[in-house]
């Protein structure tokens, strides 16, 4: 039974309401107490009680019967003794549970709102980890979402029986006692409410609930006007965060902060003590979403393994300043490594993180980042600094022991039309990322670090961009790339279409320049060799301005059954060049230098296609089958471009899509001459819901003239594919067995040489309803690459050797690709999974990477142990093959869920890079 309190004085709202419950005004006019009284509420709001006659008392119900720890009339706890005089044992102390829940309170831990997995609803299962045997589910109760402040909220009280002592001003409740005010609810077997002291004492199976938190104990003291409480021999649960623990006593403050004395904290299930944090004083603040603890030991199976005087940890997913989980590693060139990140929650729209990284062999690396989010932009600044104590590279060129990195990434819009973007990274030396790790988000570890800023204006039918882009070398085994300083583009479509004609234009003005490195390169042993930039010769050493104009007119005609698009395009390019004396003296055969160059090339094409479909049935399944033939004619006359340098151009990789391009080169420095007819056909099988079960495409080009325009130094007469009458067959195939199984393949077959130019096949399996299972099997082959050879300064066609036969660093077919890649993560028994990958290079008969190990995963922690072999790349020479060295290691990763990774962050890194689907698996798991 529960009654809403009337308008009594606010000093003591809970006691007055409890007295009303004891009075039971709607059912009886009496209470059960040491003496019997008739009581009613006076006009002033006070009690008006008179003794009952003995005759009336005969018909009263029996007094409440109390258990072994009942509350006496004066509010003290009594105990029950056996006939021998021995005290009956009470509830087990939480200190005896060794980090687990108390089974003495409930064998199934239902006293902690624990619900076994088989009893969870579908919605609750979706929020439960895959290896959790259940979840903490807060029961629905009145007032659980009440936001009324405690001082203004009325109180409701219920009990099976009650009595009131007017002289002592103590109300005693017994049997399923419930006190509820605002969002807080307290349950117990017995309660004594003291009006004079404005407090309550509760005994027996005490449960305090408020704001998604539950505290269970043997007895409690409650401040009736503020909601402050102390619960002895306490266990607690934070439902949404799956957090639990215990304490000698727990205190709930008026602001709902929970303080634990000699308490524990864990995300493990009630029957598990796999890991716990145990501290002298633990504070949990639901308002901020974080907790603190002092004199903390991390315990595994109740065995202390780590001590810290202070820790700051999250209890939900909100941000708050404090230390993040540390990372501990050992081995490699850095020795023992400890990272202790500290997070600064500066404002809702910006924050910062400091990453002090101590390396025993190098010293202290200080790294930090600042992130911001505004109404029209987002981005981050970052930086790092280290005075390196490792002198392994002290003789090498370009090395600096004062090592640093800066980074800025930005995306924004001044309004709906103006866009800004910055991607800038700079480092002290080219070996920075080979020697040092970084914790900054978004920093890309590549050979060429991007240093770019752009401003774009988007009109209704056009876009204009001002771009400045440079590159910083993070390697000594590559030549210096060109910078675009600056670049201006204007691309768009005219807003009118007379007669259905479409007018497009592409405009670019750009300055290309680079500072080639001269002199000698010194390796780790002090040996000298010529820098790779010295191998660059002829027009490849030029800097210059380029203006490129490419207007076009087309007539798109589209019907339900197909399309036809004739198009005429005109490309005009103007160059203003600078060439140093070394370039002028080393021109390639046929090259001539002129400071002013121009080129104009017309391009005519006709693109057409048909669309056929029908309904069909395959193995009892209905499909829409399509047949989509495509015909593309392209004519580009030959234009001598030998005297034009190559700034940003290379030859496109041949595949099915390249059959329908109007230029076989990327960039604007070469316009390929072509007179060809490309034929292709695509077949699709589509289910009624739009799911594409299968797609198959095959095509080939018929050439009517040789392709004479080539990259510098490449002679078309030496290339069989430049003189062939037909292109290789280009095939693409994809089949989805279902939404879990997928097979992709592309294959390019040369009919003239009767050999494969390139191809790949990839099988991927990852069930949508169980992404923990992953199988990948792939094969790649490519022997048709067109690349620039840094060691010779020449363009090379085909797989390509490194160096020349007889050279000390010569490696045959170094750039030819012939590899298989197999990876798997597969559950072998519940909670145990096998992890493996094997990437093998058939061309060089070597394993590129192989690892194998296992993963154990449960509700509160995860462990991975992996034995790995890989080809490590650490530059001590300009010859790339000499920098490759096999390495081995055994990696251990331990993740305490709800606390963070203890060790092994590198395991997560190479699994993410090496196993397709790994990131989706981890995102689902957490």
From Swiss-Prot:
Region (Disordered): 58-99
One Pfam family in the UniProt entry: LptD_N
InterPro entries: LipoPS_assembly_LptD (IPR020889), LptD (IPR050218), LptD_C (IPR007543), OstA-like_N (IPR005653)
Keyword Transferase recorded: no
Keyword annotations of the record: Cell outer membrane, Membrane, Signal
Cellular compartments annotated: Cell outer membrane
A GO cellular component entry from the record: transporter complex
Biased composition (Low complexity): 68-85
Gene Ontology BP term (one): Gram-negative-bacterium-type cell outer membrane assembly
Keyword Zinc: no
Gene3D superfamilies attached to this UniProt entry: Lipopolysaccharide (LPS) transport protein A like domain (2.60.450.10)
Record family assignment: Belongs to the LptD family.
Subunit details: Component of the lipopolysaccharide transport and assembly complex. Interacts with LptE and LptA.
Record's function text: Together with LptE, is involved in the assembly of lipopolysaccharide (LPS) at the surface of the outer membrane.
Protein name: LPS-assembly protein LptD
């Amino acid at each position: 039974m529960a009654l809403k309190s009337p308008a009594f004085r606010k000093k003591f709202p809970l006691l007055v309401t409890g007295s009303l419950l004891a009075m039971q005004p709607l059912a009886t006019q009496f209470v059960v107490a040491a003496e019997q009284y008739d009581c009613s509420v006076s006009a002033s709001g006070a009690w008006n009680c008179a003794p009952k006659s003995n005759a009336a008392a005969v018909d009263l119900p029996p007094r409440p019967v109390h258990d072994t720890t009942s509350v006496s009339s004066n509010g003290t706890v009594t105990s029950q003794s056996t006939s021998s005089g021995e005290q009956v044992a009470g509830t087990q102390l939480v200190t005896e549970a060794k980090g687990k829940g108390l089974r003495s309170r409930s064998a199934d831990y239902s006293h902690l709102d624990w619900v076994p997995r088989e009893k969870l609803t579908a919605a609750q299962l979706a929020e439960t980890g895959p290896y959790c045997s259940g979840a903490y589910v807060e029961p629905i109760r009145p007032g659980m979402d009440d936001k009324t402040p405690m001082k203004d909220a009325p109180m409701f009280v219920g009990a099976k029986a009650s009595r009131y002592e007017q002289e002592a001003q103590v109300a005693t409740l017994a049997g399923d006692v419930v006190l509820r005010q605002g969002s807080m609810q307290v349950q117990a077997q017995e309660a004594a409410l003291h009006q004079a002291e404005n407090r309550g004492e509760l005994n027996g199976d005490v449960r305090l609930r408020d704001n998604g938190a539950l505290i269970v104990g043997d007895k409690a003291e409650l401040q009736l006007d503020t909601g402050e409480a102390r619960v002895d021999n306490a266990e607690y649960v934070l439902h949404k965060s799956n957090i639990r623990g215990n304490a000698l006593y727990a205190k709930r403050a008026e602001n709902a902060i929970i303080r634990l004395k000699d308490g524990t904290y864990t995300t493990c299930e009630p029957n598990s003590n796999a890991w716990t944090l145990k501290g002298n004083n633990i504070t949990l603040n639901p308002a901020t979403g974080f907790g603190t603890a002092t004199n903390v030991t991390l315990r595994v199976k109740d065995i202390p393994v780590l001590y810290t005087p202070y820790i700051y940890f999250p209890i939900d997913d909100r941000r708050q300043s404090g230390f993040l989980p540390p990372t501990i590693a050992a081995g490699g060139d850095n020795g023992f490594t400890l990272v202790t990140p500290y997070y600064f929650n500066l404002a809702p729209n910006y924050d910062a993180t400091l990453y002090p990284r101590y390396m025993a062999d190098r010293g202290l690396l200080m790294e930090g980042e600042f992130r911001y989010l505004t109404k029209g932009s987002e981005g981050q600044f970052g930086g790092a600094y280290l005075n390196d104590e490792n002198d392994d590279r002290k003789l090498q060129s370009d090395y600096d022991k004062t090592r640093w990195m800066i980074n800025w990434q930005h995306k924004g819009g001044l309004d709906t039309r103006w866009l800004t973007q910055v991607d800038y990274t700079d480092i002290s030396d080219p070996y920075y990322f080979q020697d040092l790790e970084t914790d900054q988000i978004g920093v890309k570890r590549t050979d060429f670090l991007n240093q770019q800023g752009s401003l774009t204006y988007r009109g209704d039918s056009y876009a204009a961009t001002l771009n400045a882009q440079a590159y910083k070398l993070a390697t000594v085994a590559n030549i210096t790339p060109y910078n675009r300083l600056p670049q201006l583009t204007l691309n768009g479509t005219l807003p009118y279409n007379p007669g259905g004609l479409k007018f497009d234009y592409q405009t670019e003005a750009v300055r290309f320049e680079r500072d080639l490195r001269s002199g000698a390169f010194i390796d780790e042993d002090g040996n000298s060799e010529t820098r790779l930039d010295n191998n660059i010769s002829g027009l490849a050493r030029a800097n210059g301005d380029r203006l490129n104009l490419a207007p076009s007119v087309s007539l798109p005609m589209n019907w339900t059954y197909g399309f036809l698009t004739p198009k005429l395009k005109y490309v005009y390019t103007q160059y203003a060049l600078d060439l140093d004396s070394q370039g002028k003296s080393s021109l390639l055969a046929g090259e001539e230098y002129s400071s002013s160059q121009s080129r104009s090339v017309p391009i005519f094409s006709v693109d057409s296609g048909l669309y056929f479909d029908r309904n069909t049935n395959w193995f009892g399944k209905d499909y829409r089958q399509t047949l989509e033939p495509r015909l593309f004619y392209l004519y580009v006359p030959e234009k001598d471009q030998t005297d034009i340098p190559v700034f940003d151009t290379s030859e496109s990789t041949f595949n099915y899509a390249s059959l329908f391009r109007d230029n076989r080169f990327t960039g604007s420095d070469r316009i390929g001459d072509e007179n060809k007819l490309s034929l292709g056909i695509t077949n699709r099988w589509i289910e009624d819901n739009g799911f594409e079960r299968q797609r198959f495409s095959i095509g080939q080009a018929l050439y009517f003239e040789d392709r004479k325009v080539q990259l510098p130094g490449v002679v078309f007469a030496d290339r069989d594919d430049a003189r062939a009458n037909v292109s290789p067959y280009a095939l693409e195939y994809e089949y989805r067995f279902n939404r879990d199984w997928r097979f992709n393949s592309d294959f390019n077959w040369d009919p003239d040489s009767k050999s494969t130019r390139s191809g790949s096949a990839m099988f991927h399996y990852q069930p949508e309803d169980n992404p923990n299972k992953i199988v990948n099997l792939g094969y790649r082959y490519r022997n048709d690459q067109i690349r620039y050879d840094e060691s010779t300064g020449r363009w090379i066609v085909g797989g390509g050797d490194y160096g020349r036969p007889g050279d000390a660093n010569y490696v045959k077919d170094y750039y030819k690709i012939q590899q298989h890649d197999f990876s798997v993560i597969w559950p072998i028994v519940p909670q145990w999974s096998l992890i493996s990958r094997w990437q093998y290079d058939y061309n060089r008969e070597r394993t590129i990477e192989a690892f194998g190990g296992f993963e154990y995963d449960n509700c509160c922690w995860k462990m991975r142990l992996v034995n790995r072999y890989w080809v490590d790349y650490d530059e001590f020479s300009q010859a790339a093959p000499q920098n490759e060295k096999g390495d081995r290691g055994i990696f251990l990763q331990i993740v305490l869920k709800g606390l963070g990774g203890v060790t092994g962050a590198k395991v997560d890194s190479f699994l993410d890079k090496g196993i397709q689907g790994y990131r989706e698996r981890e995102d689902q798991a957490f």
